[in-house]
Every structure is written in C-alpha cells, then in structure tokens.
Amino acid sequence: MHCHAELRLSSPGQLKAARRRYKTFMIDEILSKETCDYFEKLSLYSVCPSLVVRPKPLHSCTGSPSLRAYPLLSVITRQPTVISHLVPTGSGLTPVLTRHPVAAAEAAAAAAETPGGEALASSESETEQPTPRQKKPRRSRTIFTELQLMGLEKKFQKQKYLSTPDRLDLAQSLGLTQLQVKTWYQNRRMKWKKMVLKGGQEAPTKPKGRPKKNSIPTSEEIEAEEKMNSQAQSQELLESSERQEEPCDTQEPKACLVPLEVAEPIHQPQELSEASSEPPPLS
C-alpha cells in the first residue's frame, strides 16, 4: 500500500514508466539508460525499495570496458547514503541494513533502545559454535609378567582357540581378565597364521578369520597328542643312551686283538731258531 501511494503522488511520466518499464525483455533494453535513470530515482526517493535489487558486488566492475556500456550496474552496486548516519558503528547489522533501507531504520531504533544488543549477539554466536568432539581415551597396553606369558604360550601350543569356560579358567589361573586373555590370543593367532603362510603351508583359517572345520582340537585329541609327544621323547632318550653305550662294546675286541698282533712277530724268530738247531739231513 505504501508503494502504491507514493506512485500516485509521483509525476505522470514516472507512473507511465512504472506501468511499462520495459519495452522488450532484451538485455540491452533492461540495461539501457532510461531504465537506469528510473532505478536511480527509486533509490534516491526510497520508492518501493524492495523492488530495487542490490546484490553485494564480488569485485569492482568499473575498470572493465565491456561493462561500462551498461550504466545500470552503477546503480545496482551503489550503496544507499540516506540512512548511513542511522547505522550504529561496530554493530553486526550493517550488511542487513545496506540491503533494505526500511529495515535499516527499524533495526537502528531497536539497537538504540537495547544497548546490550552487542552482548546478546556475541552470546548467540558463541552458543552456535559447535563444541569440539572429545577423543575417546586410549586403553593402556597390558604388560604381562614372564610367568603369565609362559602360561599363555603353553596353553596356545595345545589349544589355538579357547571356549568361554577355558578362557575363564585360564584367566583365573594367571590372574588376568577374560578380555586380556582374548586380546592376547587374537594377536598370537595372527602371528601364528603369518608364520604358517611364510612356511608355504595352507592357511589354517578361512578368509574371514573363522577356523576351518576340525581345526579346533578337542580335549581327547589334546590328551592323545600329549601321550604321543611323551612317548616320542622317551624313545629319543632310549636311542641316545644306546648310542652312548655302543662305543664301549666295540673297543673291547680291539683291545684283545692288539696283544695277539704284537705277539705274532715274536714267535716267528723262535721257530726259525729251532729249525736252525736241527742237524742238516744226511745226503
């Protein structure tokens, strides 16, 4: 309504120009000098300021020779000077006021009534800032004793995968938690798989890390394996003891033969002497 009232009070030429601003919709017609003068008068007398578009210029267009032919750009990029004295210095309302003169006056009056507006704006900007995300504290690395490592390694040699009851028993016997035992077993299994693959053997687990069928030994298989290992160790001890006894048996006949070999050359001269003592046969 305000815009229509001001248009009625204006001259007939301006009213006619307002009713039919553009003859055509060509770029040259829109940016012509006549249209430029019309928008300049609107900006000076604040007639329907919402119709005047004033985008914030990204760079200066005055130096470009190709844009000097369009005088409307100077009107669009021009900032209003009518209400510049009403804008409080240092406030955050300047970009809003430069776009809309009517809103500029209302905002200036509101800022004059509330002197603590700057503090409110700063507090709102502080609350809008996102709080920094706190990092999750890193879990400390468990340091195992030598006795615990020996117990874990011995159990791992017998059983590569632990059930929940076995894990609980092992954790209680070594003074550890189930999580510590589980983590150690996971790391140890990874080393074991790498060693198996380096040796040129088939991977003991599936691609997703699950154990293959019959790869987890049962308690009966573990006991049978222990018996076989003990029997193999006892056989090795017997063989080693027999090897140590064999050199003593082989040395005895050699010792007996040595005096006989030495005595043989001694008897030969005696036989010759006896033969020489006999008288020669008569011819």
From Swiss-Prot:
Belongs to the BAR homeobox family. Nervous system, particularly in the telencephalon, spinal cord, and dorsal root ganglia. The keyword Oxidoreductase does not apply. Keywords: DNA-binding, Homeobox, Nucleus, Transcription, Transcription regulation. GO terms for molecular function: chromatin binding; DNA binding; DNA-binding transcription activator activity, RNA polymerase II-specific; DNA-binding transcription factor activity; RNA polymerase II transcription regulatory region sequence-specific DNA binding; sequence-specific DNA binding. InterPro entries: HD, HD_metazoa, Homeobox_CS, Homeobox_TF, Homeodomain-like_sf, HTH_motif. Residues 107-141, 198-283 are annotated as: Disordered. SMART domains: HOX. This is Homeobox protein BarH-like 2. PROSITE patterns: HOMEOBOX_1, HOMEOBOX_2. One of its GO terms (biological process) is myotube differentiation. The gene is Barx2. GO terms for cellular component: actin cytoskeleton; cytosol; Golgi apparatus; nucleoplasm; transcription regulator complex. Residues 122-132 have a biased composition (Polar residues). Transcription factor. Binds optimally to the DNA consensus sequence 5'-YYTAATGRTTTTY-3'. May control the expression of neural adhesion molecules such as L1 or Ng-CAM during embryonic development of both the central and peripherical nervous system. May be involved in controlling adhesive processes in keratinizing epithelia. The keyword DNA-binding applies. It is found in: Nucleus. It comes from the Eukaryota. It comes from Mus musculus (Mouse).
